[in-house]
Amino acid sequence: DNVANVQGGMPVDDHGTAVASVAAGFSDTMVGIAPNAKLALGYYGGTTALANATNTARTLGAVAQNNSWGFVDLSGNTLYVSPTNYATIFGSGNSYSSALVNYAADGVVVFAMSNETSDTNAGLMEALPVILPQLEAGWLAVGNAIPDFDANGINSVQLISSACHEAAAWCLLADGTWNAATAASDTAYGFNVGSSFAAPQVSGALALLAEAFPALDPHDLRLRLLASADNGFFTPDQWLEIENGLKHGYNDTYGHGFLDLRAALLPIGTPQVTLADGNVTALNAPLIVSGSAFGDAITRSLSAVDITVTDSLN
């Protein structure tokens, strides 16, 4: 019911079915990250088909475009990010690269990292902003990791995909271990492990944030995911300035850390309110102080008044 568009001639496939269900599935057996999200389904069939799918996403105004695939060489090894590999895949004037640039100007492209833990570089697509820097504001890469956590947060993770490497500045981790839908029937499910199933969690998270914060554009939502990621289980050695002086630490192994959707939905930094005179004050600072003689009159009179509260990301 939540499929808005299907690219013509798309084959039935267990992998794609599982990925879609992680992003937006809803049944008695499992619930995806954003069960109310609408999906436009495309497929990997060469760069022309990929360009068509990307252009469709742009036409539909999709918040996120999930990509649970990557290029490999003739031996099946990850095609690392490099100008040479970019030229091999895209050549000059390739419609797919143009479609990605156009879509990422407004939406967010999400790519799964390689599942090879031994990779020493990021794949071409996960780290494509290294080649085309204009993509970075609309790009995320997602690795797969199993977290060890308690009520205070994540203590450590077991990385079971490639590290973030060159994609670190726009990389997140999620747990790509899911019981998800398969293509066998409309009641069939199977166990899945891989970065392919971590990426749609981030894409679904962007959809949920779009519902929660309708005034924010997809690039703003992307920044919320990066700024709220749990990076307490490692020592950052690089810092990304998110906005308004707010920085978030990352490193080449874990990127910005583990996806934390709850934190992304809560205020980030200092909640604040703009007063009538234009001054900005912290939300926990007293705005009105009344004497006991007023009783609850001021509280009651202001109970129906709406105020706009922003956080450090506005």
Please state what every model-predicted region is:
Residues 14, 25-26, 42-136, 185-200:
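Substrate-binding/access-modulating region of protease and related hydrolase catalytic domains
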Residues 2-10, 74-95, 102, 119-134, ...:
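Surface-exposed intrinsically disordered loops and tails
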Residues 20-23, 42-44, 176-250:
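Hydrolase catalytic cores
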Residues 63-66, 141, 211-314:
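C-terminal subdomain of the subtilisin-like protease fold in secreted/lumenal serine endopeptidases
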Residues 24-28, 58-59, 70, 101-105, ...:
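Sec-exported extracytoplasmic/periplasmic mature domains
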Residues 1-49, 59-60, 73-76, 104, ...:
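Subtilisin-like serine protease catalytic core
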Residues 1, 128-211, 215:
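Extracellular S/T/G-rich loop segment that most often corresponds to the catalytic His/Ser-adjacent loop
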